[in-house]
């Protein structure tokens, strides 16, 4: 009699939780039925109704896993924690031409990571990011990515600001437009913010200065304009800052030198001006610095280059720079591999000490007003080959050993 009561008790518990019975019978941790149905429906919205999850993947968190779906145990039951849609692998979930964000996707309330890669591509069926229900994922979602979706149009939903646990927001290579919502600056846990390769306009929000945990900020290849806010100096944890290929103007704020941990600073292809007034020497963690194609101007020799020991890549071409090429570059930048100073207004002699930089493998100084004679060794010219260029300096003399190297290469 006692065993009979136990049997009915177990059956009632299984019924209450709506479990997948096949899993329970095998002694495997079960999945809540509503969770499984929500997963199947959410995927169908992207890949099509032909996709019959219950037949193809009856145990999506167990012995019939779905490519792009990961699960984890919570209180003894399986829940979906990662959902990746798009052709990352041969057997990945691929989007149909006409996709839909079904409400069931937002019922996966243990979801930590959600990504869409090369999914929204149809010319005839443009897609916008839903502006509703994201708050249902606020307690779990840590990573959200829309990558390489050319027909993903519209604006960044302001409701994203409710995703307080978000650590990574990547909206890269899409067709998104409009201004970046200032409310994104309220996502205090963000460590990576990548909005590159869209058509965003307007200014960078001042509120971004609140993102003190941010490690990577990439807003490159948009149409952002206006001034770079001084609050950028508040991103004290930042390692990489890429604002290249925008329409930004004005002086680079001195506060940017507060970013002591920065290893990459890329401001190429904007319209920054106002001279080299940033104390770059204080940014002694920099490994890559690219300021080219900005009418910044200023004297190249005013920077204490000898203090920038970790620089590997330095591109200061097309910047209207004046003055001489300082010997302090050779004295301090022992790790430097790439140096481009071409198409400026630099004058004076080119110091042979530049040859003493042990790692340098590319040096470009064409298009300046350099004078005197090049005094590098044959070995230096052989080492750099075509990666050395000093053309279009009208008063610069080229020694015979350099001419022979050029004639040999041109053959």
Question: Which residue stretches match the model-derived regions?
Answer:
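Plant-biased, solvent-exposed loop and capping regions
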Residues: 1-411
């Amino acid at each position: 009699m006692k065993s009979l009561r136990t049997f009915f008790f177990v059956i009632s518990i299984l019924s209450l939780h709506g479990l997948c019975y096949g899993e329970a019978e095998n002694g495997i941790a079960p999945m809540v039925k509503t969770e499984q149905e929500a997963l199947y429906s959410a995927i169908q919205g992207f890949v099509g109704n032909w996709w019959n999850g219950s037949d193809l993947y009856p145990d999506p968190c167990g012995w019939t896993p779905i490519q792009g779906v990961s699960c984890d145990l919570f209180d003894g039951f399986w829940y979906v924690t990662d959902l990746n849609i798009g052709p990352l692998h041969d057997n990945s979930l691929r989007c149909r031409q006409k996709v839909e964000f079904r409400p069931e996707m937002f019922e996966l309330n243990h979801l930590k990571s959600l990504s869409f890669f090369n999914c929204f591509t149809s010319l005839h069926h443009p897609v916008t990011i839903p502006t509703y229900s994201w708050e249902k994922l606020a307690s779990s979602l840590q990573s959200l990515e829309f990558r390489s979706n050319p027909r993903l149009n519209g604006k960044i939903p302001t409701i994203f600001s409710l995703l307080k646990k978000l650590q990574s927001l990547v909206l890269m290579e899409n067709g998104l437009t409009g201004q970046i919502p200032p409310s994104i600056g309220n996502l205090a846990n963000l460590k990576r913010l990548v909005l590159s390769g869209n058509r965003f306009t307007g200014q960078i929000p001042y509120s971004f200065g609140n993102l003190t945990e941010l490690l990577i900020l990439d807003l490159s290849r948009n149409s952002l304009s206006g001034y770079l806010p001084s609050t950028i100096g508040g991103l004290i944890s930042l390692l990489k800052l890429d604002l290249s290929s925008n329409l930004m103007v004005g002086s680079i704020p001195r506060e940017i030198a507060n970013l002591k941990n920065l290893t990459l600073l890329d401001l190429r292809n904007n319209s920054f001006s106002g001279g080299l007034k940033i104390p770059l020497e204080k940014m002694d963690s920099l490994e890559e610095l690219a300021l080219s194609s900005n009418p910044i101007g200023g004297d190249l020799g005013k920077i204490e280059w000898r203090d920038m020991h970790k620089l590997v890549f330095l591109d200061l071409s097309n910047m209207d720079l004046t003055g001489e090429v300082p010997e302090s570059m050779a004295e301090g930048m022992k790790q430097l591999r790439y140096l481009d100073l071409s198409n400026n207004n630099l004058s004076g002699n080119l110091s042979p000490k530049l040859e003493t930089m042990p790692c340098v493998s590319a040096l470009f100084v064409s298009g300046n007003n350099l004078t005197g004679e090049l005094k590098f060794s044959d070995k230096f010219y052989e080492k750099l080959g075509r990666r050395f260029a000093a053309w279009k300096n009208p008063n610069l003399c080229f020694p015979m050993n350099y001419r022979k190297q050029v004639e040999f290469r041109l053959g």
